[in-house]
């Protein structure tokens, strides 16, 4: 709802087409439960910036999909109900945002229209600030904007006239939210100088043209005609980029931070899948084993309730894929002594054997 309100509010100012709520929750399973399952991408512009906006799920059973969306963010808008206060998944979202490196957050307290008591809204705000502090975000400095996405959206859909600043209080609150996002979330430093890399999010075929892989360019840049390697899960393959497309526009080149579709020469749909990476030749290699320094989250932090031993086989999330791995050895982070068992809260160095090769590099 907020995503739709933002795109429509900004479109009335810029004169561009906004996205209606029904257009954002587009997959059939999303409609069935009235919730956002897969991350949906929209774009919009403020006076100073162009945004690619990922609408992340707010439901605990879709955390896996949120990971694939959150791993791409330069900043986030955390939506909390002003009427109900933070939910259990609010903590999950903050923990996840911290873990995947979302640098800055702006908070939107939604459903302000359902709160009669001003003090109640202030209490919710205090609770949110405390929660931000608990997850190492600056609670005191984080902008918190109140409003009602639904009432703003109704105001925007009920009229055919352009709604400018000052003509509707609920729409103004959405514009104030985006002013704060513009000011508070720093412009990211793009990794354009590094070797090109894009994690594959999705793959589809275009009849008569070939296979297209989509994803966000993590670093470097790519031009039509460049040679790239497809790395991970299967044998590494070399191919040539024959087309680039972003938000329905054909491009000659693309750089870090862009969400693009990439047409690849001589590649079948079966040759490439989500979880692989497309990279500058020789810049990254596939691995089936690695060593990692790990902090095992406690139950209170949203982690495990029980200890685990060597031989434990968890899922490892890397970029856009999850792959099973076997924990081969465990050593104490302090004195490097061999550990038989790891308890939530421990810091350990673990050696892991993966069931499939994936493109990883030293962190």
From Swiss-Prot:
Its EC number is 3.6.5.3. PANTHER family: ELONGATION FACTOR TU, CHLOROPLASTIC, ELONGATION FACTOR TU-RELATED. This is Elongation factor Tu, chloroplastic. Keywords: Chloroplast, Elongation factor, GTP-binding, Hydrolase, Nucleotide-binding, Plastid, Protein biosynthesis. The keyword Transmembrane does not apply. It comes from the Eukaryota. Coiled coil: none annotated.
């Amino acid at each position: 709802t907020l995503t739709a309100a933002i795109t429509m509010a900004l479109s009335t100012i810029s004169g561009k087409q906004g996205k209606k709520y029904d257009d954002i929750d587009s997959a059939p399973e999303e409609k069935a439960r009235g919730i956002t399952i897969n991350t949906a991408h929209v774009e919009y512009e403020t006076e100073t910036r162009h945004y690619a906006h990922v609408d992340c799920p707010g439901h605990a059973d879709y955390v896996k999909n949120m990971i694939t969306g959150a791993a791409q963010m330069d900043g986030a808008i955390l939506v909390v109900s002003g009427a109900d206060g933070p939910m259990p998944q609010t903590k999950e979202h903050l923990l996840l945002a911290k873990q995947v490196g979302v640098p800055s957050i702006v908070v939107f307290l939604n459903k302000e229209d359902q709160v009669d008591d001003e003090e109640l809204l202030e209490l919710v705000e205090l609770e949110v600030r405390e929660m931000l502090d608990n997850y190492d975000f600056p609670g005191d400095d984080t902008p918190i904007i109140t409003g009602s996405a639904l009432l703003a959206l109704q105001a925007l859909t009920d009229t055919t006239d352009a709604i400018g600043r000052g003509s509707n209080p609920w729409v103004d609150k959405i514009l104030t939210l985006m002013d704060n996002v513009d000011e508070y979330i720093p412009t990211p430093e793009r990794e354009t100088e590094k070797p090109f890399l894009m994690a594959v999010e999705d793959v589809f075929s275009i009849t008569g043209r070939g296979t297209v892989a989509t994803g966000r360019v993590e670093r470097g840049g790519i031009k039509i005609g460049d040679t790239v390697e497809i790395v991970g899960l299967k044998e590494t393959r070399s191919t040539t980029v024959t087309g680039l497309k972003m938000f329905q526009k054909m491009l000659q080149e693309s750089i870090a931070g862009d969400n693009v579709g990439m047409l690849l020469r001589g590649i079948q749909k079966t040759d490439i899948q989500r979880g692989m990476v497309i990279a500058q030749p020789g810049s990254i290699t596939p691995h089936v084993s690695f060593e990692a320094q790990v902090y095992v989250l406690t139950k209170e932090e949203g982690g495990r309730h029980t200890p685990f031993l060597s031989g434990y086989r968890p899922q490892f999330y890397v970029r856009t894929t999850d792959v099973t791995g076997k924990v081969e050895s465990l050593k104490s982070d302090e004195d490097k002594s061999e550990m038989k068992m790891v308890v939530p809260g421990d810091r350990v160095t673990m050696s892991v054997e993966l069931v499939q090769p994936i493109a990883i590099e030293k962190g």
